Amino acid sequence: MGKWTRRAVLSVGGVVGGGLVLGLTEVAFAPNRLGILPKAERNASWLTVWLRITPDNVVTVMVPHCEMGQGVHTSLTMMAAEELDADWSLVRMQEAPAQDAFANAHVIRSFLPFEIPPLLGRGFDYAAFKVAQWVGLQVTGGSSSVRGTGRYGMQVAGAAARAMLIEAAAARWKVPTAECDAKLSQVLHARSGRSATFGELASDAAKLAPAVHPPLKPRAAYTIMGTSVPRFDIPSKVNGAAQYGIDVVLPGMLYATVRAAPVFGGRLRSVDTAVAAAMPGVKAVVKLDDAVAVVADGYWRALKAVRALKPEFDDGGNGGVNSEAIFAAQVQALAGKDLGKAGKEGAGAAALARAAQVIDAEYRVPYLAHAIMEPMSATARCANGRCEVWAGTQDPLSARKVAAKAAGLKPEAVSLYNQQLGGGFGRRLPGSFDYVEQAVKIARAIAPVPVKLIWSREEDIQHDYYRAAFVAQFKGGIDDAGRPVAWVAKFNGASETMAARPPYQIGNLELRTSDVQAHVREGSWRSVAYSQQCFFIESFMDELAHAARQDPLAYRLAALQHSPRHHAALAKAGQLSAWGSALPATHGRGVALVEAFGTIVAEVAEVEVTAEHIIKVHRVVAVVDSGDLVNPDTAAAQIEGGIVFGLSAALFGQITIEKGRVVQSNFHDYPMVTLANSPRVTVKFIRSGAPLGGMGEPGVPPIAPAVANAIFAVTGKRLRQLPLQAQLLSAMSSMA
């Protein structure tokens, strides 16, 4: 439901191109647009660019975010419908096309550490929208959809439209607006008993000017938000009708696959194409700068042919690099004096000198692949001075710009039809649209025939944009009572400063960074720097508790007296997990806490370590304070999924580099947690009333340190490097 086809995009092109540009600016920037609608659309009234109401009283919400399993199409629609006071049974959803009018600039607000004052909001949003148009921002990532677009875009648009409909009804009935109310897609006038549907009023309402700052409902008045309404995307996924990027089929379409330079930065030197060209079904062999592609009448034929090739690549001077050398370079950099400053409170070094005890630790995390279920795929057709692309991306506008550059065209000559994503996790964000670029270049070479590019799983694993490998070094000081009084951390990478800050009251904090760059491609990975930093912080906090000879949970709670929300979440997690109760001798519990993307998550893991040193995670309790909830069922699913995603990385995830290239190639050497070994997960929400936080990523970071801390509780062995299973086996074998 709600995907754009080529015909649909063309039919509303006049709407988008003709000035229906409210986007994520304040609704007050929207002029009367009814007159500029193409004839095919004039039976519909657009109150804002996000809301369209037809005479049959159907409300369509335009959602400028992609669907990749997180339920955002439903959640954002709920937020608009709530403020509109719509009848949910009459509400529909349409994913916004890759057009500048639908740039989603309000995601910028979600990353600001402060609120924009109302008096400045209009100007800020206008400037942000212009920037979003210029850079091509239509992004889904950073857990920003609900807390950015939803809070500042959808709710405001719904409230403004509701006020416009009430004003239109009051004018029609010649009564004060204060005497009118909206409910279930109708405007009611109680004194006279009159009523009119939104559909009957929409054309008049569309002529009115929206309010700049329409009042939003109090939480107590919600009837849609806060309920677990069924998601729009589920039925088509159950019956097989959902179309992902890899599912696209066009008349006369050919198939392509690639072999890229195995060493990042390498280039194609030469390739003898004769062998592949002679194979059944092969139509063309296309040389790219750093890869070779085979085009055939079927994917399997293309794959067999590309595997028959023997391309020669240079290694860009990186053929001697391996993982150990990368880590060694980071360690050397951290030993230097010229380190960047990422944060300072008090006097860390001086406090260490005065501490009763100083604890040192070094942690390491490896590169991680995204390993999404749907490999990289894109379909392209270049003909008659235009280019069309069908792909699943996390930023259609940015992907359109990449496609335009590859096609040698202006963005206006490119149409990108975004599809559902079989996973994203940051792999399909700007900066990683290599698969789109390749598809367009191949399509240009065989124009005007359309071609679908599909990467093999091996290409997908070995040519990812990986989560960065980090080394972090910590020094912590505790006083005579065991309280933490100093925290000094050094780590590599351009990490987010907020991710590196512990949530605990320390008093003296110092954060320093190095910036050693390897040739390995790096990119966003679900929860970004929080995934590394939470492992470091929560592992080290556990070490401080152990040095202080105090219970790890109680130790943390004592350091959270300044933060009632964090304290409440952690205390609740302890209660629900029966922290401190008896366990079998081979079982242990570990705890971890994070605040990420405006959401606080506390997790307790119950772990078994078998006689064979195999880690089994039996249960995870997660307590989440995201302020409030839009769709509780979807929110719980995101936390549960984040825990399983993070657990795969914590136990098994590791990309290693040898001779400049990635060693792992498929799920046999890059394994995942399966249904059989997934833990039982309990999720409890705290509705604190704080501003809405994100949900897609905050469940990921705490699971690795929670499991590592549980392993220590069982074995007494502190694992300071991921993945945990390989590290535990190595540690135990060295002790044998």
Predicted features, each with a name:
Residues 1-624, 712-721, 728-736:
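Structural alpha/beta core scaffold segments of enzyme domains
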Residues 528, 541, 686-699:
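Amphipathic, heptad-repeat alpha-helical segments used for oligomerization and assembly
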Residues 627-631:
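Cytochrome P450 core scaffold surrounding the K-helix E-X-X-R motif
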Residues 635, 657-673, 693-696:
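Hydrophobic alpha-helical bundle architecture
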Residues 643, 698-709:
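Conserved phosphate/anionic-ligand binding catalytic regions in large, soluble enzymes, centered on
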Residues 674-692:
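Generic long, charged, amphipathic alpha-helical segments
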